[in-house]
Design a protein with these regions (language model features):
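Positively charged n-region of N-terminal signal peptides that target proteins for export
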Residues: 1-5
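Surface-exposed, low-hydrophobicity interaction/linker segments
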Residues: 27, 31-78, 98-116
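Sec-dependent N-terminal signal peptides
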Residues: 7-13
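Bacterial signal peptide processing site
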Residues: 21-23
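C-terminal motif of bacterial Sec signal peptides marking the signal peptidase cleavage site
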Residues: 15-19
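Short, conserved charged micro-motifs
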Residues: 95-103, 142-145
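A short, solvent-exposed beta-edge/loop patch
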Residues: 79, 117-154
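A short acidic-to-branched-hydrophobic micro-motif
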Residues: 84-94
Length: 154
């Protein structure tokens, strides 16, 4: 009887732990709409920004020479400016790939990719919410953009 009761308590404990596990849900919406929300939430103007869809040819410029695949990506950078600024959103194939993707982006992205300007290493932010990853590089507004992105899940 004690064995049955012990097994039952263990089983209930496992169900409790699994049932209360944190599951991070994906952020819904088009990357274009989400990009606008990130800028607006950070209070950063995006009027003079150009958005570019990522493809196999331009991905190394925006993310570095990464090896992971993703469903879609969108980059936002100034059309013409002497300010180093880049925001990239990518939707991964699976949220389970987020940690690997963030690590690889952080290692391979070039914060000195512009001709006359650069972003300090401490102002390169790579975060994720579900299957969505942001790379924000900006010496003045990078942290605001990162925080705005993280608020998309709330």
């Amino acid at each position: 009887m004690k064995e049955v009761l012990s097994l039952l308590l263990v089983f209930i404990g496992i169900l409790f732990l699994v049932g209360c596990g944190k599951t991070e849900k994906n952020v819904e919406g088009s990357l274009s709409d989400l990009m606008t929300k990130v800028y607006d939430g950070a209070g950063v103007s995006h009027e003079d920004m150009e958005t570019v869809e990522l493809n196999s040819e331009n991905t190394p410029f925006y993310l570095g020479d990464v090896s992971f695949s993703f469903k879609e990506g969108l980059a936002s950078e100034p059309i013409m400016s002497s300010v180093a600024h880049s925001v990239v959103l990518i939707r991964l194939n699976s949220a389970s790939d987020a940690e690997k993707a963030k690590k690889e982006i952080k290692e391979k992205v070039d914060p000195n990719k512009w001709v006359c300007v650069s972003v300090d290493e401490e102002n390169v932010y790579v975060e994720s919410v579900g299957d969505l990853v942001i790379l924000a590089m900006d010496n003045q507004n990078g942290e605001k953009l990162k925080d705005s992105f993280l608020n998309l899940s709330k």
